[in-house]
Every structure is written in C-alpha cells, then in structure tokens.
C-alpha cells in the first residue's frame, strides 16, 4: 500500500492522502489487522500539526460535508486521558456558561478513563443528548445542547477496535474534542498532554475558531486546576496565539490538590454537580468550576478579563441562574430569567 510506504519514510500526508487514511480505517469491510498495521505506522512517525488538521477535516467532511455553523457558540471539553478521576467539571461548567446567554454545544462521551463521562452524568441527571439535526432548535429554546460523540460520529466505532489493539496513544486520543459537528465560534479545550497544546491551538485556528483557550492543568489534569500553574495557549480574534500560565490563587481562589477534585460514580457526580449549581457547595469543587467557567466566559467575549469571568460565574451560581438553566434542560420549568 502506497500510504504505508510514505509512513515508513516519515513523509507528511496531504489532505487527500489523510482522507484516504481515514476512509481505510473506517471501512467495515477491511479487516482489523490491516488497519492496525496502518495506524501503527502512522503513530510511529512524528505527527505534524498540519496532519492533525487534515485528520479532523477528513472526519468532519465524511460525516458533515456541509458542516453547520452556529454563530457565537462554544464548547467546553477535554481530551480525557489524565486518569485523575475528577468529577464532571466541564459538563457542570456548561450549565453556568449557558446561563450567561452564550450558546453552548457540548460534545461529550461515555467514560473511557474515568468513572463517569459526560454522557454518563447526563443520563443520571435525567437530561437527554440532542441529535445533531435538532441542535439549532434546542439552542434557540434552551441555549444549551449536549451531543453524544458516538451518536454524532458512528463511523468511529470502526476505529475503536483498532485503537484497542495498539498499546500506545494514537492521534485519535486528541481528535475527539476537535470534531464537534458544528463550526463553533469559541472553544475551551483541556489537554492531558502538554506537548500537544500549541499543535491543538493552531488546529483550532485552522478550523476557524474566532477565539480559543487550550490548556493543561497543573499536575497533569485536562482542566484548569487549583493546585498550581495551569499552562495556556490562547488564540485571539486576530489569529495570534499567546502562551502564558494562570494560577487560581492569583484570582482569590484557595489552593487545593487535584485529589480533592475526584468524583465517583455517575450518581455521586450527579450530587456534586447539583450541589455546585444550587450554591450549596462552597468547597474547592465549586472553585474549580468557577475558574473553568471564567475561562469560557472570557474567551467567548462575555467579559474582558478572567478575573471578571470569576465574578460573573460566581453571580450566576449565587443568583440561581445556573440552577434555572439546569432545571430548564431537565424540563422542570419553561420560564427564562433575563
């Protein structure tokens, strides 16, 4: 196979060749062993940033050749893989951000390395995921839509067995948060591998994001944490990417270890999320949600600074608006709070 020879010679693939690569891996008629050979060779070579963009574009175009756009929308998510077993921070954040009037299209999955993935938590909360075709109406009515990654990209089921047979991480460990079916305006993306931060920030620029934050949490998490310096690459509206660190204590938040942020089963994480949204939780779990919500409010241009984002996120919780957003999503109330 020509692709195998190119990969053996460490030759960077073109967009057309990458599409062939994806088509091969997602073809159910090709046996898994042959797919393993190809993905193994791709994984052995150094993955270039351009190739990450090509892989993401190929997957999106395969499923959504006319990718829909929702102006002003944001997704807050992480790559997973940090093995921290934290509670569902980004899902909890999504309710708060949506309560600020920002359209949130959250792309999530079931648990892979944690006890409870985004979809697992939603099931426990009694909130259904939204079909891609129904997202515009869902956003219009409630301002927040949760999309199941497995439902929006069923072709990925043909790649899963291949990944399981390869012992090392592959490019598919980082593409999940990048293939939202909608062309987003903003994104906050947590990454477990700090060496991939700039690559992912550049890919988000290639995908047309107006603004984005790509971060690696202190001590290895794929969320901003309270335990030290969080590394950030920020894409601004001018297309510039800047690199800096943020520390929760600089914003008046108390230092806490990553272990203090651990969750549990979907049922246990449900109670954590509800306690935070209701304002009952005053612990570090609330603080880490406020910090991550602040980044989303900042990157989506709702506020001018991260500090202002922390103030607004706190108000959204304490005023009850975040809880109202949750109740709307569950169908408990229909009235909006302006």
UniProtKB/Swiss-Prot annotation:
> What cofactors does the UniProt entry give for this protein?
Mg(2+)
Q: Which chemical reaction does it catalyze?
A: N-(5-phospho-beta-D-ribosyl)anthranilate + diphosphate = 5-phospho-alpha-D-ribose 1-diphosphate + anthranilate
Positions of Mg(2+) 2 binding: 222-223
Q: Which GO terms describe its molecular function?
A: anthranilate phosphoribosyltransferase activity; magnesium ion binding
**Gene Ontology cellular-component terms listed:** cytosol
* Principal EC category: transferase
- Listed Pfam families: Glycos_transf_3
Query: Keyword Magnesium on this protein?
Result: yes
* SUPFAM superfamilies named among the record's database cross-references: Nucleoside phosphorylase/phosphoribosyltransferase catalytic domain (SSF52418)
One GO BP: L-tryptophan biosynthetic process
Which residues of the sequence carry a binding annotation for Mg(2+) 1?
90, 223
Keywords, in A-Z order: Amino-acid biosynthesis, Aromatic amino acid biosynthesis, Glycosyltransferase, Magnesium, Metal-binding, Transferase, Tryptophan biosynthesis
Q: In which pathway does it act?
A: Amino-acid biosynthesis; L-tryptophan biosynthesis; L-tryptophan from chorismate: step 2/5
Keyword Ribosomal protein attributed: no
Family the entry assigns: Belongs to the anthranilate phosphoribosyltransferase family.
Q: Which NCBIfam families match?
A: trpD
| Subunit structure, interactors included | Homodimer.
Record's PANTHER family?
A: ANTHRANILATE PHOSPHORIBOSYLTRANSFERASE (PTHR43285:SF2)
Q: What is this protein called?
A: Anthranilate phosphoribosyltransferase
The record's gene field reads trpD
């Amino acid at each position: 196979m020509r692709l195998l020879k190119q990969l053996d010679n460490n030759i960077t693939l073109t967009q057309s060749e990458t599409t062939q690569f994806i088509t091969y891996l997602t073809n159910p008629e090709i046996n898994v062993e042959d797919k393993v050979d190809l993905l193994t060779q791709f994984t052995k070579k150094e993955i270039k940033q351009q190739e990450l963009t090509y892989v993401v574009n190929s997957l999106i175009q395969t499923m959504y050749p006319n990718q829909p756009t929702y102006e002003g929308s944001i997704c807050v998510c992480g790559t997973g893989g940090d093995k921290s077993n934290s509670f569902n921070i980004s899902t909890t954040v999504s309710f708060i951000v949506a309560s600020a009037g920002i359209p949130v299209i959250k792309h999530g999955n079931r648990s892979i390395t944690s006890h409870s993935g985004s979809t697992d938590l939603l099931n426990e909360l009694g909130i259904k995921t939204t079909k891609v075709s129904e997202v515009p109406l869902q956003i219009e009515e409630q301002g927040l839509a949760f999309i199941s990654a497995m439902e929006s990209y069923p072709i990925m089921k043909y790649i899963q067995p291949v990944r399981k047979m390869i012992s090392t991480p592959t490019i598919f460990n980082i593409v999940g948060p990048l293939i939202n079916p909608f062309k987003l305006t903003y994104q906050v993306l947590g990454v477990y591998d700090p060496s991939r931060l700039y690559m992912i920030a550049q890919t988000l620029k290639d995908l047309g994001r107006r603004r984005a934050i790509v971060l690696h949490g202190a001590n290895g998490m794929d969320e901003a944490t309270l335990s030290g310096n969080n590394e950030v690459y920020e894409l601004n509206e001018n297309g510039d990417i800047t690199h800096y660190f943020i520390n929760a204590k600089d914003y008046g938040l108390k230092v806490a270890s990553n272990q203090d942020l651990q969750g549990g089963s979907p049922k246990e994480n449900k109670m954590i999320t509800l306690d935070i949204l209701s304002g009952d939780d005053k612990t570090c779990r609330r603080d880490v949600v406020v910090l991550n919500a602040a980044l989303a409010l900042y990157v989506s241009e709702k506020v001018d600074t991260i500090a202002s984002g922390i103030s607004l996120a706190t108000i959204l919780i304490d005023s009850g608006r975040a809880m109202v957003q949750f109740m709307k999503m569950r169908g408990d109330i229909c009235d909006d709070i302006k």
